[in-house]
Amino acid sequence: MEFPASVASLSANTVGSNDVLRRSVAYHPNIWGDFFLAHTSEFMEISIAEKEEHEWLKEEIKKLLVQTEYDSILKLELIDSIQRLGVSYHFEKEIDRILRYVHQTYPIYETENKDLRMLALRFRLLRQHGFHVPCDVFSEFIDAEGNLMESIAYDIQGILSLYEASNYGVLGEEILDKALDSCSSHLESLITDTNDDRLSRQVKEALKIPISKTLTRLGARKFISMYKEDDSHNEKLLKFAMLDFNMVQRLHQNELSHLTSWWKELDFANKLPFARDRLVECYFWIMGVYFEPRHEIARKILTKVIYMASVLDDTYDVYGTLDELILFTSVVRRWDISGIDELPTYMRIYLRALFDVYVEMEEEMGKIGKSYAVEYAKEEMKRLAEVYFQEAQWFFSKYKPTMQEYMKVALLSSGYMMMTINSLAVIEDPITKKEFDWVVSEPPILKSSSIITRLMDDLAGYGSEDKYSAVHLYMNEKGVSEEEAFQELRKQVKNSWKNRNKECLEPRSASVPILTTVVNFTRVVVVLYTDEDAYGNSKNKTKDMIKSILVDPV
């Protein structure tokens, strides 16, 4: 991704043996260091007893799924709890079978049950799993002015459920637009009026980031605490979720320990001090996309890829001179290690490390018969360098692009396409050449997700970067105020979410592994770029999030 320089604005600085005038940014240093390597002995191994208990509890949950009556509120709540506790990956077939039955046997528009909470929960679960169910059923809860009906004004759980459901709307579903606005306003006022601390926390979390945009592990960590406080919770499910969370966390800690060794050997903090040093943050990013144990190889490689992409961004955005970047881009374009001798030392150091990452990718993918995918991954990294170079040329020539010119380049420089294709290249799921060609063609779901990434990135970094962004260019072209520009760009983000939602509904535009990758990457963007750039400045919110899911057990 293109990571905004939020810590300090760019400034001219004379550095280097040849007294070359370069830009610089006062990034904060790495805040984790070798923590995960130094504390390896404290990260306990998973015992045989834990594995046995985990397996027994998993079978008990499967029995619960079978025994609970179909389409009852209890069945729907059970599925919702399993998903929000972060353990649905153990029960994908069972949940899919149940929801297909619910969809086929109990069409939402034919139900006689008028309970808002159940209607909204059923609607959300079906939409989450790609079923295109109509939203007309909610019209009786919204009046002509778009306000909530008086009859449900005090049904807080129902309103909260409708709020979550309305976040799965697509363009043209006005009833869901009205429901989202009305529910949001109602819930915001509730926070100050209620004395129920648990309900207040639940509402605050939902308004901050709804379920549709929540990272599984972060959401699970928070929901485990809320679920524990719920008097009606299932003790076996709670115990299973806590055990599973801690077991997976230990796996992640072990992976980070090995990645920290790789990071220490690179020693970019000393060799390339101009770049952001964010290994653990990069792992957090990738873990937000693929947290399940089976994606161990993907997490290892993709953490290295995104770390290298971050340094690549800073090379173009902060440190390289135009002459250096011309040569550098040429070498990346050719992907030829023999051509690096003409480059400055810092660029040679970087490119050797970059090429090594892709050699490792080729070796790992060769083991599972997926070597063909690596070429797609390389091509996207080359393309990322090309668009970074285009932006650097704009900077050095002081050229102000039009909004159209900017977005054409900036959608790619957001890094979304590069990371999506590199991710699909290294997961074990079989992604065919035909599917790769489809993804590379930038279909609607990728375009929408790239728009979300780029605009949220620009909105978060506005005012802290010494370069043009969508905010600057929109204000200039339309002659509007900063507030008006923000309002319009946020509207574009909102509409892009609706387009993305549509592409995830049956008939789906792509296979589940592709859609899951696309959706999860967009969720990471929401977490890191809502209101601030929490990657560039990872000392506060990001540090707390990482600590909650990678350091502290539940």
UniProtKB/Swiss-Prot annotation:
Check the record and name the SUPFAM superfamilies matching this protein.
Terpenoid cyclases/Protein prenyltransferases (SSF48239), Terpenoid synthases (SSF48576)
Which Pfam families does its entry note? Answer: Terpene_synth, Terpene_synth_C
Q: Which GO terms describe its molecular function?
A: magnesium ion binding; protein homodimerization activity; terpene synthase activity
Per UniProt, the short sequence motif DDXXD motif occupies residue numbers: 313-317
Q: Which GO terms describe its biological process?
A: diterpenoid biosynthetic process; response to water deprivation
In what tissue types does this protein appear? Expressed in peltate glandular trichomes. Present at low levels in flowers, leaves and stems.
Question: Binding residues for Mn(2+) 3, per the UniProt record?
Answer: 457, 465
Summary of subunit composition and partner proteins = Homodimer.
Name of this protein: (E)-beta-caryophyllene synthase
Q: Which organism is it from?
A: Origanum vulgare (Wild marjoram)
Q: What is the lineage of its organism?
A: Eukaryota, Viridiplantae, Streptophyta, Embryophyta, Tracheophyta
The UniProt gene name for this protein comes to TPS6
